Amino acid sequence: MDFNVSPIVAMITRVNGNEISVIDEITMEGSNTFEMAEELLNRYPDNRLWVYPDASGQARKTSSNTSDHHILRNAGFILKVKSINPPVKDRIAAVNTSLKAVDGSVKLTVDPKCRHLIKCISGQTYKEGTRVPDKNSNLDHMNDALGYL
């Protein structure tokens, strides 16, 4: 999950050994963590859900007495999160390797209904002459969320 106001995004995945299948996605414009938690619970009411969120969600906001992580825990989610996010280049390498490893194996599959994620993966651009994702394209949020997994 990647925390933003526009958009806040989440992917629903199934993990089987080393294989990850993205089976659904949620993109909410002008929203917040409370609403995302509610949407996840509405879509998957009888499932035990683990959330792999952005590590920055542990910080309380000046406008609130709580954090994004606290909101998710209070909603009943199990959080799998490190104290800091891995470096961007490491997350990109991990996702790229999952899409297709050197040996040709594929460890990450994406359901065709996950159109926003597919658009983000295929359309991600980088700042000229760098390996730094271009945040102006607005195609980075789903990719960031995928990298937290």
Regions found by a protein language model. Name each.
Residues 8, 49, 143:
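Residue-level detector of short, conserved catalytic/binding motifs and their immediate flanks
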Residues 135-149:
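Acidic, Mg2+-coordinating catalytic module of metal-dependent nucleases/exonucleases
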Residues 5, 67, 140:
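Short, well-structured alpha-helical interface segments that form or flank functional binding sites
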Residues 1-15:
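Gly/Thr-rich phosphate-binding beta-strand-loop-beta motif of the actin/hexokinase/Hsp70
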Residues 17-134:
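Mg2+-dependent endonuclease catalytic cores in nucleic-acid-processing enzymes, primarily RNase H-like
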